[in-house]
């Protein structure tokens, strides 16, 4: 009712709603509502004037391409600077980074593997933005989340690659797209359910790890190199 009231008061032709995709009260009965679905849903949940998925992967896997898709626009600040000096990270150190929801780095064996590497290799740093702290080590750095786009770009500029450790995976994967757009390789767990974040990437853009041993091998053999062209 509130949506109808404000929509008519503002003389709107359309209302855009970004949500999980399920049927709920966030739809107008009087004004054409455009639904941008972010998560997997059954076809019976489709509603609104127009209903689109957030990624090609989501449309293909959960609607058999019956629904169109509209991905996010990935746009980052143009700054070339980074956070290494402020964080006392040396130029020759390899930096693996990740940013996302605070509980999104939740695969326990990945956490333990990173800690094991940090204890043995002084030339490797793990850098997290907005991720809940899961261990204490001087070369595993946790930064508070931010809405500052310049700071976020500086964070990505500080990293040589992204280490992805979310057990569910992504129906889009904005953080992964931001890293990839800057030529950063993605290391992602092989046995996750949702794989939109690597769906359209070529093999040079990502590698999947399947176990602790496999992840150790991939990270220990990673070499600093020029970023690939996306």
Residue ranges and their predicted role:
Residues 1-59:
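Extended catalytic core of nucleotide-activated donor transferases of GT-like folds
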Residues 4-8, 148-160, 181:
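Short acidic alpha-helix that forms the nucleotide-activated donor recognition element
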Residues 11-14, 154-171, 184-185:
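Acidic donor-binding loop of glycosyltransferase active sites
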Residues 42-68, 74-78, 133:
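A short, active-site helix/loop in glycosyltransferases that binds the activated sugar's phosphate group
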Residues 64, 70-138, 142-149:
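Conserved catalytic-core segment of nucleotide-activated headgroup transferases in glycan assembly
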Residues 153, 176-181, 195-196:
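Short alpha-helical segment that forms part of, or immediately flanks, the ligand-binding pocket
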Residues 164-175, 188-198:
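Nucleotide-sugar-dependent
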């Amino acid at each position: 009712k509130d949506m109808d009231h404000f929509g008519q008061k503002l003389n709107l032709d359309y209302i855009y709603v970004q949500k999980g995709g399920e049927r709920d009260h966030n739809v107008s009965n009087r004004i054409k509502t455009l639904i941008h679905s972010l998560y997997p849903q059954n076809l019976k949940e489709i509603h609104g004037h127009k209903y689109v998925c957030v990624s090609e992967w989501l449309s293909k896997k959960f609607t058999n391409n019956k629904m169109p898709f509209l991905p996010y626009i990935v746009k980052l600040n143009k700054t070339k600077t980074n956070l290494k000096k402020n964080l006392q990270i040396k130029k020759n150190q390899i930096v693996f980074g990740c940013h996302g929801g605070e509980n999104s780095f939740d695969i326990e064996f990945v956490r333990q593997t990173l800690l094991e590497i940090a204890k043995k290799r002084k030339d490797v740093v793990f850098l997290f933005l907005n991720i809940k702290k899961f261990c204490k080590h001087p070369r595993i750095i946790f930064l508070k989340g931010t809405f500052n786009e310049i700071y976020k770009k500086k964070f990505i500029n500080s990293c040589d690659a992204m280490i992805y450790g979310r057990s569910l995976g992504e129906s889009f994967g904005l953080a992964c797209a931001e890293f990839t757009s800057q030529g950063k390789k993605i290391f992602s767990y092989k046995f996750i359910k949702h794989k939109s974040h690597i769906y359209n990437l070529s093999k040079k853009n990502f590698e999947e790890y399947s176990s602790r041993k496999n992840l150790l091998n991939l990270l220990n053999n990673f070499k600093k190199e020029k970023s690939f062209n996306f």
